[in-house]
Amino acid sequence: MSYTLFTDEATNDSYSVAILIKESTFDKDSIKRHYVNPLPECIDRGSVIAYSLPYNKLAISASYAKLEATKMIKLLDAQKVSYIYVADATYFKAFTGLTKAKPNLGYLLKCGIAGYEHINVVYGISYGSLIHNERNFEDLSLSMFTLASALTNSYSKIGKDLFGDVELNTDNDYSKLHSHPMLAADIETTGLNPFESELWTIAFAWNEHDGKVFDIRGDKTALKEFLTTYKGKLLFHNATFDIKHLVYHLWMKHDLDIEGMLDGLDVFRNKFEDSQGIAFVATNNCNENVLSLKDLAHEFAGNYAVDVKDITKIPFDALLEYNLIDVLATNYVWNKYLPIAIKDNQMDFYENMYKPSIMTIMQMELVGLPMDNDVLNKLSEDFTKYNDDLQKELLSYPEVITTLKSIRKELVDAHNLRLKTVQHPDTHYDHIEFNSASPNHVAKLLYETLGLEVLNRTKTGNPSTDNDTLTLLRARYPDIEVLRCLMDIQSLEKILGTYIPAFLKGTLKADGRKYLHGSYRFGVLSGRLSSVNPNMQAIPSTSKHASRVKECFVAPDNWLLVTADFSSLTI
């Protein structure tokens, strides 16, 4: 562990601040430039010391960091250090006992090691990360502001003074909202899928501190009337989510009500704005954009976003407050990134490409992709049986039998090494079977039992066993039948493990079909849309079993299902 000081004076017996940073970035001039110089002039530079953080390899375990932190805290306490700036996420968690680092950016926290709670900890940003992620400049500034304010006794918790003129759980009187030319809006629902969830609350805010939250678990007629007649702009963050839910619950009479869906979408078509879209065009760069409201508004609202996976299990008053902070934060994000988007000439794209695309995406998500239930069930049954047959075939190969014996023997030997007297017999692990989904088992079969050449390796340096590697091995060793069997099994595993379960969870509608309703997102590194819940863009199209999978998708009654393949569109 190295250390450095920032004055020419002799070493002190005590210091106020200790900057802790990874050994690979432990450079005095860089530390001084990024962490010492930004401190207020009233802070004595002689009261600052920097230490390198012990690393036994490129990435360290939580247990290793905890052990080293326990050693370091004793030294820091002996030097009367009051503030620790930890520019490393793993060590920050070790010093505080917290499970996450990034949400605690900008907070002054107590040390979590017993007996040292009097020492304060600040989560810092390593200056080395600035090279590959320019967004870390803001995070570094926030962390240094936290340290500086703590040292000058001016620290205030992020989000402390958010609320101005606010009303929680107001009645259904939306009339006063008409006077505001723009309202940030946000809903809280019992789930992500509008077809399987309910609306609970909706919040509106006309600036970064003032707003109202409405309980909409009951009658929603007044809300629908307000949204229809409101002449201003409605600002959402991730507009597709909120508008999609509002359209379904307020305008659609049933799951297949296309007319109601179109009427609802028309209400929002010319009156919505999206702070996520503005942030997307304002920050789009070579790094994957971080576009969640909680991340974009962190320096404004702080870590208010406790993971709410089931809103029915939290106090309703807490939900109302959470909903209100969302709309205040939405206004903050809009006000922060709109000037940047305008300065960078991004508004034409936002108005004429992004927003129209959002309307199309919302319609896609509400309509969904229909599936024939009978064909889907038959596909699941056939593929399950086929996989069972392939597994039986695989286990019958002499090479696999030999590999399995070796695996069991190694387990017994390893176990017996830990025993002092009683030894387990060779049959102790006979319950273990060869697992075709285990990279270790397959690698042992391919590269030890069969002695095949290692053509590819994983990121960790182990011999690869993925489908691409099996394809190469099959071409090089066409007479080894066990390779063909493994490839067939792998081609089924993703379908049975990922796609079939997602298909079976589709929304069953009145026409007897199940529908997939994926969610599409901007902001991925490739610049394309991404899809989740389920991933509609990764449905098999060219694999061995793709044609069977495609048979599940059918057109609704009186409709045609048409596909267009723009395979070279990005060129």
Describe each model-derived feature in a short phrase:
Residues 23, 54, 88-90, 128, ...:
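Anionic group-transfer/hydrolysis microenvironments
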Residues 67-80, 218-233:
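Short, basic/hydrophobic alpha-helical segments
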Residues 82-89, 184, 232-242, 561-563:
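Acidic beta-strand-to-loop metal/phosphate-binding motif
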Residues 29-31, 94-98, 193-199, 244-249, ...:
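A short acidic (Asp/Glu
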Residues 34, 38, 42, 96-131, ...:
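Metal-dependent phosphoesterase core characteristic of DEDDh/y 3'-5' exonuclease domains
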Residues 153-214, 218, 256-270, 288, ...:
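Conserved "right-hand" nucleotidyltransferase catalytic core of DNA-directed polymerases
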Residues 1-154:
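A polyanion-binding, active-site-adjacent surface
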Residues 20-21, 87, 125, 185, ...:
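Active-site flanking residues adjacent to catalytic metal/cofactor-binding acidic residues
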